[in-house]
Amino acid sequence: MKIVPPRGMQDFLPHEKEHRDRITEVIYKSYISHGFNPIETPSLENIERLACGVGQENEKLTYKIIRRGLTGAQTVQHPDELIDLGLRFDLTIPLVRFWNTNRARLPKIFRSLQIGHVWRAEKPQKGRRRQFIQCDIDIIGQPEILAEIELLVATLSTLEQLGIRTPKLHINDRRILFSMLNNLGVPHSCHVYVSIVLDKLRKIGLDLVKQELCEFPALVAYLASSVNSNTGSTDLCFDVSSTKDITHIRRTIQSALPHGCKFDCEDLCRIIASVNEFTQTGVFFDPLLVRGMGYYTGPIFEILHDDYSIAGGGRYDGLVERLGGLPTPACGFSIGFERVLGLIKESVSLDPKKMILLYDPKVDPNLVVSVKLEFISKGFIVRPELASRSRRNQIELAKREGFGAFLYLDPLSPPDGLLAKVKPIL
């Protein structure tokens, strides 16, 4: 029997879990300060909701749950009815279901905060596991661009608190993307397929993308002239971080689009100007930015660090209605926790109120518990540990876990005055 976790999943040692919890706490407190309300949704959703077509490629990666109580004959005769549930592959679809279920008890404009696990049955690689954490904020019921501005400013502020100070914000609009595809001869019926292929540009490279899109020669020619074939990065990422002048931003966006491609980009220009007003982040208009989910309908954005995506989101106005609710505007942003974690060096600071209680084997167990409870009442974190012959090694190991103090308890230790005998770990 294998003793390792399933492929693409991971155990975390105590010090690793503490490090992850510290980062989660920073994200949580930052988003709370921006007025977002924490919620929790189930890990499982009905399969018809997860497979409704809005998740695009991620729907193929859904972990599916076989219905309980089926007989062998049912399993063979009705294979399509085997599955009724699946593990969520993102937090947005569960959020929309949550909104449709609880709408009457929620504010008209609802600011949601979710931090939780999601699952995708994909090939594990660096920075990509089958079980991972997403940190999502969403605003449901707000049609104005204030939603996008709030989400962007809150997320960039949170990343700064985590010590990530040089991210780049890439921004586009799904409507600009589709207008550009129309201009390049891609029929409306092929927009979703072409978007899926373009979204894989960084992963599979220009040559493979050109092969998959060979039936659209104008688009292939546009890509060949604007994409670095070695890196998959686009030469059309126009820097719009140096100005709050909406007219200048509008001209920059129009100059990035193919000749003859026109679109009202006023909202996008105002969003960019506002981000420049409130943050020092580099902002780039990227006409080839897609974002993988099929539910996006308007502005879309992605935050990169060293050309590595660490967060992304956008507006998805049609999703609430598509999943059974009333027409409702919505917009969201998600931090990829595992990717952000990789940018933050784990550091251990010694806590003087975190104490290891070393006790002699002859000490009465009731005394150990009594001393432990006494120090807990004084605000200490206490871990009893049987003293070994090499107490120095024990203390050194405790130090690596952030313990900043220790106390040695022997049978002759007086019950009073123990606080004065606590020694710092240096």
Curated annotation (Swiss-Prot):
One of its GO terms (molecular function) is histidine-tRNA ligase activity. Homodimer. GO terms for cellular component: cytoplasm. InterPro entries: aa-tRNA-synth_II, aa-tRNA-synth_II/BPL/LPL, His-tRNA-ligase, HisRS-like_core, HisRS/HisZ. It is found in: Cytoplasm. CDD domains: HisRS-like_core. SUPFAM superfamilies: Class II aaRS and biotin synthetases. It comes from Tropheryma whipplei (strain Twist) (Whipple's bacillus). Its main location: cytoplasm. The gene is hisS. Keywords: Aminoacyl-tRNA synthetase, ATP-binding, Cytoplasm, Ligase, Nucleotide-binding, Protein biosynthesis. This is Probable histidine--tRNA ligase. Its EC number is 6.1.1.21. The keyword Ligase applies. It catalyses: tRNA(His) + L-histidine + ATP = L-histidyl-tRNA(His) + AMP + diphosphate + H(+). It is an enzyme of class 6 (ligase). GO terms for biological process: histidyl-tRNA aminoacylation. Belongs to the class-II aminoacyl-tRNA synthetase family. It holds the Pfam family tRNA-synt_His.
